[in-house]
Swiss-Prot record:
Subcellular location: Preautophagosomal structure membrane; Cytoplasmic vesicle, Autophagosome membrane; Golgi apparatus, trans-Golgi network membrane; Late endosome membrane
Residue ranges that the UniProt entry lists as topological domain Cytoplasmic: 2-61, 155-290, 302-319, 329-371, 425-470, 481-483, 493-839
Modified residues (N-acetylalanine): A2
Top-rank lineage group of the source organism: Eukaryota
Any one Gene Ontology cellular component term annotated for this protein: phagophore assembly site membrane
UniProt GO BP: autophagosome assembly; bone morphogenesis; mitophagy; piecemeal microautophagy of the nucleus; programmed necrotic cell death; protein localization to phagophore assembly site; reticulophagy
Function: Phospholipid scramblase involved in autophagy by mediating autophagosomal membrane expansion. Cycles between the preautophagosomal structure/phagophore assembly site (PAS) and the cytoplasmic vesicle pool and supplies membrane for the growing autophagosome. Lipid scramblase activity plays a key role in preautophagosomal structure/phagophore assembly by distributing the phospholipids that arrive through ATG2 (ATG2A or ATG2B) from the cytoplasmic to the luminal leaflet of the bilayer, thereby driving autophagosomal membrane expansion.
Nuclease is among the record's keywords: no
Protein name: Autophagy-related protein 9A
Residue stretches spanning the membrane: 62-84, 129-154, 372-397, 407-424
Catalytic activity: a 1,2-diacyl-sn-glycero-3-phosphocholine(in) = a 1,2-diacyl-sn-glycero-3-phosphocholine(out); a 1,2-diacyl-sn-glycero-3-phospho-L-serine(in) = a 1,2-diacyl-sn-glycero-3-phospho-L-serine(out); a 1,2-diacyl-sn-glycero-3-phosphoethanolamine(in) = a 1,2-diacyl-sn-glycero-3-phosphoethanolamine(out)
């Protein structure tokens, strides 16, 4: 079998965004004409503060929010100390009588102050408790640290406040109503006036995103390449994902900004990590550092655990009492947020996408309620509700019933039981259509593994999607367990990957002039990191391990071009967007629809629009998703994908330039063909409304267009995967401790694998084509549920694969040109200069 090494390679600079003659530009300004914002040294921190102040709606809101955070921490510590040392619970529970009268026979009411101990007694009990004193001292030191940091941040944000007022000319009262694109456009203009960055004459939108999201882009790439230990197989639970805020904080502490991290400062990777000569020594140093941080986490585990429990109790106890079903609701997991995030996507942009996908995701997960669990919940709710109704009726008749011991507690518990049981009872009017719901979810979240399509009705797909969209109760439980589990993950799981992490940062870091060291994936260069099966065939030179998985490069490029219509992409990216535009035009014309790309109207479309959307862009998505199930006779399985793609292409063609004074619409009678705009503008579409629509409306249409592009690109990828089923996916080798590739012995005979090999982020095998009776059964499921067919069920000749040393798949007899260059030995690259990527 064919074997080849899968070592990371050094990337070469692929393009230069600098205008001619500005490659080595250093802008000099006379001393007397410098503004207060000329040559800001730490632009990463500066732009991050500008963005944070915008997201927090101004200086006043940010100031008050920070003050309340300090007060909240102080309240949790003080109130917990009071409950532990200053309350007489015997009086509170009526185990001890209190006599306020001279006549013992007279009845006396017990008040709350009666249960409070005197100040002297309370102080003495606190002083006698050594453990409590230790916790209070640590909490006090931490609070003083936060107070000093708060004062420092206020001084820094006051400078940002002045920058908004004088440089950007945006008053604080208007800031909550300005979009980030408006603020960003003014920053670009301010660069021309004040020379914020002296290394470039002009700033681009991508420069600002790189500054704000430098470390976040690295985290997205690490998750995309499956280098962080986030997946574990537990007995009885199977494969689980564990990624909490505490674990993420430790990852960032180790890699980015902590003492001894890989970065010299916010914008520069240390020089020794850019060369391969000391990779083993650096890996050992990183491994030791991870060990010490893991030990520190283990020592601080009791304090962090106590804080997590107290904070969770004070945060969710009232919510649980008021809305017992709140913990049964779902939320996007931290792993899901990182897996679904585009390169160069700000937090509010990600949150907006996930918010749009929340309702269809909830409906999809509700489709899988167990019939047995539903039956038990109905009967449990009946019995609990019957007892609760009797107690409520007795209380209405005579309120003295509440004075009986445990009656109020029983009423509360029965109410919680009824509410929880109702959350497991599905709506009797709900229609089971998981395929359509999954397509709606895909339109908003933009990413999903290949083997989900056509298998939306399977429990395996449901379980994997639950890793992205988890119960709120599971989220809280993971955060509570985080102080205990995090040290174990750091010491036993992250340390063996130290060498791979060192290689990753060396080979996937480029130095951009005027920006600093950035993750090469964040350049969104389809030539360096594109995937052949994601419209990059013939346009990419990336090897297997250089390719971003799940179409991350292509979808991120499309998202950034739509979100920032003024951005001028490099040549390769422009060619990719132009190719996609031409493909949209061809498929839209082949759809056989009306001249303007108008989707046919019928009663079902109108009802779906009225039920699923309140705005025209969302109704267009509803039309596209529901179209194939509601229009025309059923097609063969191999033709359904073509019809899906044609419908999405027709919808994309309906995004056309608006004439002055024309109302915004998703069904303009003209198409983008011959509109005269360049490939990027035509592909994004949203730029043609600039200056004619308000920013919020423009953002809504841009989001809708990106949703349609995501559906369209996934359909193209699916058809290319069917034509070329062998998908080359990067996988790390679990047993590789040195990072160097070692050939793995394979059998002599050819062995067939699943038509769509497992994904890096979701390494679960797709269903194999089964026996005839299995195929017939799947056909029955397809007739029942509708939607996209499973490409894995299409009969085809078996393909021959060989197992890569790091877990990927390679076709037998693959060309030797795909072999990467071996990593040099110790000291072989000591004299090589660091890689520079001029932009």
């Amino acid at each position: 079998m064919a074997q080849f090494d899968t070592e990371y390679q050094r990337l070469e600079a692929s393009y230069s965004d600098s205008p001619p003659g500005e490659e080595d530009l250093l802008v000099h300004v006379p001393e007397g004409s410098k503004s207060p914002w000329h040559h800001i040294e730490n632009l990463d921190l500066f732009f991050s503060r500008v963005y944070n102040l915008h997201q927090k709606n101004g200086f006043t809101c940010m100031l008050i929010g920070e003050i309340f955070e300090l007060m909240q921490f102080l309240f949790v510590v003080a109130f917990t100390t009071f409950l532990v040392s200053c309350v007489d619970y015997d009086i509170l529970f009526a185990n001890k009588m209190v006599n306020h009268s001279l006549h013992p026979t007279e009845p006396v009411k017990v008040t709350l102050p009666d249960a409070f101990l005197p100040a002297q007694v309370c102080s003495a009990r606190i002083q006698e408790n050594g453990s409590l004193i230790t916790i209070l001292v640590i909490a006090g030191v931490f609070w003083v640290h936060r107070l000093i940091k708060f004062i420092y941040n206020i001084c820094c944000y006051w400078e940002i406040h002045s920058f908004y007022l004088h440089a950007l000319r945006i008053p604080m009262s208007a800031l909550p109503y300005c979009t980030w694109q408006e603020v960003q456009a003014r920053i670009v203009q301010t660069q021309k006036e004040h020379q914020i960055c002296i290394h470039k004459r002009e700033l681009t939108e991508l420069d600002i995103y790189h500054r704000i999201l430098r470390f976040q882009n690295y985290m997205v790439a690490l998750v995309n390449k499956s280098l962080l230990p986030l997946r574990f197989r537990l007995p009885g639970l199977g494969e689980v994902v564990f990624f909490t805020r505490g674990l993420k904080y430790n990852f960032e502490l180790i890699l980015f900004w902590g003492p001894g991290s890989l970065f010299l400062n916010e914008w520069s990777l240390k020089a020794e990590y850019k060369r391969g000569g000391q990779r083993l020594e650096l890996a050992q140093r990183l491994s030791n550092r991870i060990l010490w941080i893991g030990i520190a986490n283990f020592l601080l585990c009791p304090l962090i655990l106590i804080w997590q429990i107290l904070y969770a109790f004070f945060s969710y106890a009232e919510v649980l009492k008021r809305e017992p079903g709140a913990l049964g609701a779902r939320c996007w997991s931290l792993y899901g947020r990182c897996y679904l995030r585009h390169f160069n996507e700000l937090e509010h942009e990600l949150q907006s996408r996930l918010n749009r996908g929340y309702k269809p995701a909830s409906k999809y997960m509700n489709c899988f309620l167990s019939p047995l669990l539903t039956l038990l919940a109905k009967n449990c709710a009946f019995f609990a509700g019957s007892i609760l109704a009797v107690l409520i009726a007795l209380t209405i008749y005579d309120e003295d019933v509440l004075a009986v011991e445990h009656v109020l507690t029983t009423v509360t518990l029965l109410g919680v039981t009824v509410t929880v049981c109702r959350s497991f009872i599905p709506d009797q009017h709900m229609v089971f259509c998981p395929e359509q719901l999954l397509r709606v979810i895909l339109a908003h979240i933009h990413y999903m593994p290949d083997h989900w399509q056509g298998n939306a009705h399977r429990s395996q797909t449901r379980d994997e999607f639950a890793q992205l969209f988890q119960y709120k109760a599971v989220f809280i439980l993971e955060e509570l367990l985080s102080p205990i589990v995090t040290p174990l993950i750091l010491i036993f799981c992250l340390r063996p990957r130290a060498l791979e992490i060192i290689d990753f940062f060396r080979n996937f870091t480029v130095e951009v002039v005027g920006v600093g060291d950035t993750c090469s994936f964040a350049q969104m260069d389809v030539r360096q990191h594109g995937h052949p099966q994601w419209l990059s065939g013939g346009q990419t030179e990336a090897s297997v391990y250089q390719q971003a998985e799940d179409g991350k490069t292509e979808l991120s490029l499309m998202h950034f071009a739509i979100t920032n219509p003024g951005w001028q992409p490099p040549r390769e990216s422009t060619a990719f967007l132009g190719f996609l535009k031409e493909q949209v035009q061809r498929d839209g014309a082949a759809a056989g629809l009306a001249q303007g790309g108008l989707l046919p109207e019928n009663a079902l479309f109108t009802s779906i629009q009225s039920l699923q959307s309140e705005s025209e862009p969302l109704s267009l998505i509803a039309n596209v998703v529901a179209g194939s199930s509601c229009r025309g006779p059923p097609l063969p399985r191999d033709l359904q994908g073509s019809r899906h793609r044609a419908e999405v292409a027709s919808a994309l063609r309906s995004f056309s330039p608006l004439q002055p004074g024309q109302a915004p619409t998703g069904r303009a009678p003209s198409t983008m063909t011959g509109s005269g705009v360049d490939a990027r503008t035509a592909s994004s579409g949203s730029s043609v409304w600039e200056g004619q629509l308000q920013s919020l409306v423009l953002s809504e249409y841009a989001s809708t267009e990106m949703s349609l592009h995501a559906l369209y690109m996934h359909q193209l990828h699916k058809q290319q995967a069917q034509a070329e089923p062998e998908r080359h996916v990067w996988h790390r080798r679990e047993s590789d401790e040195s990072g160097e590739s070692a050939p793995e012995e394979g059998g002599e005979g050819a062995r067939a694998t699943q038509p769509i090999p497992r994904s890096a982020s979701y390494p679960c095998a797709a269903p194999r084509p089964g026996a005839p009776e299995t195929t017939a059964l799947q056909g029955g499921f397809q007739r029942r549920y509708g939607g996209i067919t499973d490409p894995g069920t299409v009969p085809r000749a078996p393909s021959h694969f060989s197992r890569l040393p790091l877990g990927g798949w390679a076709e037998d007899g693959q060309s030797a040109s795909r072999h990467p260059e071996p990593v040099p030995e110790e000291g072989s690259e000591d004299e090589l200069p660091p890689q520079v990527h001029k932009v």
